[in-house]
Design a protein with these regions (language model features):
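Iron-sulfur-associated redox domains of electron-transfer enzymes in respiratory
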Residues: 1-121
Length: 121
């Protein structure tokens, strides 16, 4: 039985997921080794039963953290995919300045509309 695999995205450019898609196209035999049940960049299905979860992107909101915890509860194995998931990536640059200043710079007068906190891998 092939392990069920899911891919999830958080705050990122999603380039790492696109690299996975490119790799799968170049090595189609990998698709015989796993069953992909969720992967927004590649399929429209949304399976909730998976053994391995690949997570791309950094965590920048409370809702991200809650979603990540749900993913972790379902997966036997959780893999951080890419620099954003592992180290915070480019998104972590905002951690170098006061968060209120960053929010005002990025969102302007609508800064209060967006719930965000310091970027975490």
């Amino acid at each position: 039985m092939r392990p069920k695999v899911a891919f999830f995205d958080f705050t990122s450019c999603e380039g790492c997921q696109l690299t996975v898609v490119d790799s799968l196209q170049a090595h189609l035999d990998l698709l015989d080794a796993v069953e992909i049940v969720q992967f927004r960049e590649a399929i429209s299905e949304r399976g909730e039963d998976y053994a391995v979860a690949f997570v791309e992107g950094s965590i920048t909101r409370e809702s991200d953290e809650a979603r990540l915890k749900q993913i972790r509860e379902r997966a036997a194995v959780l893999v951080a995919l890419g620099a954003c998931a592992h180290l915070g990536g480019v998104n972590a640059i905002k951690n170098l300045a006061p968060l209120d200043d960053v929010r005002k710079y990025v969102y302007g007068v609508k800064a209060e509309w967006y719930a965000t906190y310091a970027t975490r891998p």
